């Protein structure tokens, strides 16, 4: 609710007051600091990691939602409420300045009921997939609680190590602590 009240609503109201029409997708890059919520950026596009997580939670048809928005209709957006999704980005060594490329990647098609693996900076090589950018993969763990989703994502990463890559080990930690209060 804080995000809606302090970021979204004032932004939309300011755009209306300035006569700035907009139809599309806007996402706010936010950070929670010791001094509270801070806006880092606004983007008029889908952000990859954010969208990959949100799409797992969205029950509505995205194409229909976009069509409704473009045609001036109020979209019906339904979200799954019986599960959580947590995404961890796997980045190439050297990211963001000079990411290593051509890192051999494991078989991403192997079945895993607990996680969805999204490829990002990836290309086909003669022996399989190779890294081709800074952000290589997103591992999306799903669970009945945020803690369960986090556990599944990190369990997958531990069981499938990739040389010359790294990922943050604290994704979801603050939210989990906050929801446990």
Question: Which ranges hold each PLM region?
Answer:
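N-terminal loops that bind phosphate or other acidic moieties
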Residues: 1
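Short, well-ordered beta-strand elements
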Residues: 40-42, 135-142
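Active-site "cap" helix and flanking loop/linker of ATP-utilizing ligase/carboxylase catalytic domains
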Residues: 4-27, 43-114
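Short arginine-rich
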Residues: 155-171
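Short beta-strand elements
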Residues: 28-32, 37-46, 121
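Short, well-ordered alpha-helical segments
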Residues: 139-158
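A cross-kingdom feature marking charged/low-complexity
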Residues: 171-181
